[in-house]
UniProtKB/Swiss-Prot annotation:
Its main location: cytoplasm. This is Dynein axonemal intermediate chain 1. Pfam families: WD40. GO terms for cellular component: microtubule; outer dynein arm. GO terms for molecular function: dynein heavy chain binding; dynein light chain binding. GO terms for biological process: cilium movement; outer dynein arm assembly. The modification Phosphoserine is found at residues 134, 137. Consists of at least two heavy chains and a number of intermediate and light chains. Interacts with BICD2. Interacts with CFAP45 and CFAP52. Interacts with CFAP53. The gene is DNAI1. WD repeats lie at residues 383-423, 432-475, 540-580, 582-622, 630-669. Part of the dynein complex of respiratory cilia.
């Protein structure tokens, strides 16, 4: 047998091509029509052909063809609009848009390529690897099966037994099937980012971050000098001259400075020099302090603005007081609160007078002005040598505060001026009181538009003070003479016993009418026009009268309180009280509510605050709530805020507590079907008159 390779015919080499191989030897011709290069031995299809031109094609001369045109590529889009305007809500006008998007899209095509680093690319690469490995394993299995078949064929022929053939074939088929099915590798499980389970773990502490801000650097100056013995001496001499000049200025400004010692003057000058340095940052520091207090007392501010006691819906004739802020100052520690007054212009600002009611323990006095925006520290601080027993703020000039001292002096403080001394002060020459001043009250200006206020003292004098040319001028309005108490002195002189005035109040409509309460328990109805006699006398209380107050709505009604534990409501045309309330403790102060003619509050020495509403209950208080500890503190004064439903209460330890009235303590008239709710002073007067008429009818019957 011949090998299979000998049967194959031998291939003859191809004949050489009769063409010119060297193209460089043949001359090249340039076709004038087409401009293509043609060799001598090129094929026909390579040769140039005549160009076909359209009949309307423009024919240009050689000069026009050789002319060059420059083209400049710019990034501006010629189709972009140039005059787009948009309306500005901030300025209220149409504004021209200067920047226009110059992007022009010429061609877009959606691709089907996947990045290798993406999740989809990794999955596709993994599937390709699996398919390639499966194909390789299948090829290996097929080659092994072919080898096994070649080896088993001669063995089967030699055996010659036909009975074992089906068994062998069955086993071979089983082996082939096992080998033909490749073992698939386990597919790696891909994580699903959207399938997760919550597990508790320890929280991670947030790292600290530093914040920086750019600011203007402080100005710097270069200073150089020499220090020796005589220069130090000259510097000390200049400082001494400055101190002497400041002392002379203080002496000329205030006569009080004469009594002050050298140590006090040194303290004042040092404080003034320090205050000059920090005046630039006081306003910024005050704003920052208010911001800090706003965050600190945010829960209290929220209660003040929005909280209403929901339990009042289930109790008709009871109310509560919610404690809000507590105002105190270390400088006024253990000084009793002797006076409270709200500012007539700024509803969050109030003044507090500090002194002592114990005549054996008299000390200095303090005038503090607090704001509810900053409960931690007072807005203004003024100190005095004698205790402050009363104060009042001017209605038209809310920056003027008049105070009365325990030593009988009266003074006017101006909040606009930076110094801590009073702008005006009485003296022995100007007719000051000889006993403590218990109450002061601003009045209307006189005919010459001079400021005017009144004061009452234990020396029995009601004095009118007028500010004339930066000087206080006094006029005795009336002397509180006790009737039937005249005694004869030497040479037949009649000596009158003078009553001790403790409180007074002026009528809101009748300008000349006012009431005066005394330590003897009597109340005198007086007139500014008569200085020798009283219009009427009321045997009001068995002990000293602590407060007298006209009703803000009803012109005939006033109220008084005393240390004999009682609060009485009067009609000034009747000498007997309309209502009498026993509070089981000495009453320090009473105040009418500005929003209702029938609501008033009283404070007692056992630490309780009592709130009455005669339209709801004319026999008992609708709120009896302790504000301070009974054994340690005593309440001294109370005042209603003219706008907000809050009151301030002072005690004998120098603390002032702010309390919010619950809805039952400030009920308004209920709406009736088909009728509008009437509001105003006329409604309040009618409401109180209705109660007084019932009492008047009972008294006339008896």
């Amino acid at each position: 047998m011949l090998p299979a390779s000998s049967k194959m015919p031998h291939k003859q080499p191809p004949p050489p091509r009769k063409q010119s191989i060297s193209m460089g030897r043949g001359a090249r011709k340039r076709d004038e029509d087409s401009g293509t290069e043609v060799g001598e031995g090129t094929d026909e299809w390579v040769q140039s052909k005549a160009t076909v031109k359209p009949p309307d094609q423009l024919d240009l001369t050689d000069a026009e063809l050789k002319e060059e045109f420059t083209r400049i590529l710019t990034a501006n889009n010629p189709h972009a609009p140039q005059n787009i305007v948009r309306y500005s809500f901030k300025e209220g006008t149409y504004k021209l848009i200067g920047f226009v998007d110059q992007l022009a899209v010429h061609f877009t095509q959606v691709g089907n390529l996947i990045p290798k680093d993406s999740d989809e690319g990794r999955r596709q690469h993994y599937r390709d690897e699996l398919a390639a490995s499966s194909q390789e394993s299948a090829k290996v299995v097929i080659s092994e099966t072919e080898i096994l078949e070649e080896e088993e064929e001669p063995k089967e022929v030699e055996a010659g037994s036909q009975t074992d053939v089906p068994i062998v074939e069955a086993s071979e088929k089983m082996a082939e099937e096992e080998l033909m099915t490749p073992k698939q590798p386990k597919e790696r499980k891909l994580t699903n980012k959207f399938n997760f389970s919550e597990r508790a773990s320890q929280t991670f502490n947030n790292p600290l971050r530093d914040r920086e801000c750019q600011m203007e650097p402080p100005p710097r100056t270069n200073f150089s000098a020499t220090a020796n013995q005589w220069e130090i001496y000259d510097a000390y001499m200049e400082e001494l001259e400055k101190q002497e000049k400041t002392k002379e200025k203080e002496k000329t400004k205030t006569p009080v400075a004469k009594k002050m010692g050298k140590m006090a003057m040194r303290k004042m000058t040092s404080m003034e020099s320090q205050s000059d340095d920090i005046t630039k940052v006081t306003q910024a520091a005050k704003i920052v302090e208010r911001m800090v207090n706003q965050n600190t007392y945010d829960d209290v501010a929220q209660d003040f603005k929005y909280y209403e006691d929901a339990a009042d819906e289930y109790r008709d004739q009871e109310g509560t007081l919610l404690p809000l802020w507590k105002f105190q100052n270390d400088k006024a520690k253990r000084l009793a609160v002797t006076a409270l007054c709200w500012n007539p212009k700024y509803n969050d600002l109030f003044a507090v007078g500090h002194g002592s009611y114990d005549f054996m323990k008299q000390s200095r006095g303090m005038l503090l002005l607090y704001s509810m925006k900053n409960p931690s520290f007072p807005e203004y601080i003024f100190s005095s040598e004698s205790g402050i027993m009363c104060l009042d703020m001017h209605v038209d000039h809310p920056y003027l505060v008049v105070v009365g001292h325990y030593d009988g002096n009266v003074a006017i403080y101006n909040l606009k001026k930076p110094h801590s001394q009073p702008s005006f002060r009485s003296s022995a020459k100007s007719g000051k009181h000889t006993d403590p001043v218990w109450q002061v009250r601003w009045q209307k200006d006189d005919m010459d538009h001079n400021l005017n206020f009144f004061s009452v003292s234990s020396d029995g004098r009601i004095v009118s003070w007028t500010l004339v040319k930066s000087e206080l001028v006094h006029t005795d309005v009336i002397k509180l003479k006790v009737e039937g108490s005249t005694t004869e002195g030497l040479e037949g002189l009649q000596i009158h016993t003078v009553g001790c005035g403790t409180a007074f109040d002026f009528h809101r409509e009748i300008d000349y009418l006012f009431l005066v309460g005394t330590e003897e328990g009597k109340i005198y109805k007086c007139s500014k026009s008569y200085s020798s006699q009283f219009l009427d006398t009321y045997d009001a209380h068995n002990m000293a009268v602590d407060a007298v107050s006209w009703n803000p709505y009803h012109t005939k009604v006033f109220m008084s309180c005393s240390s004999d534990w009682t609060v009485k409501i009067w009609d000034h045309t009747i000498k007997t009280p309309m209502f009498i309330y026993d509070l089981n403790s000495a009453v320090g102060d009473v105040a009418w509510a500005p929003y209702s003619s029938t609501v008033f509050a009283a404070v007692t020495t056992n630490g309780k605050t009592h709130v009455f509403d005669l339209s709801i209950n004319k026999y008992e208080a609708i709120c009896n709530q302790p504000v301070v500890a009974k054994k340690k503190n005593k309440l001294t004064h109370v005042q209603f805020n003219p706008i907000h439903p809050i009151i301030i209460v002072g005690d004998d330890r120098g603390h002032v507590t702010c309390l919010k009235l619950s809805p039952n303590l400030r009920k308004m008239p209920k709406e009736k079907k088909g009728q509008e709710v009437q509001k105003g002073p006329a409604v309040e007067i009618a409401k109180l008159d209705k109660l007084l008429n019932l009492v008047r009818e009972v008294k006339t019957k008896t």
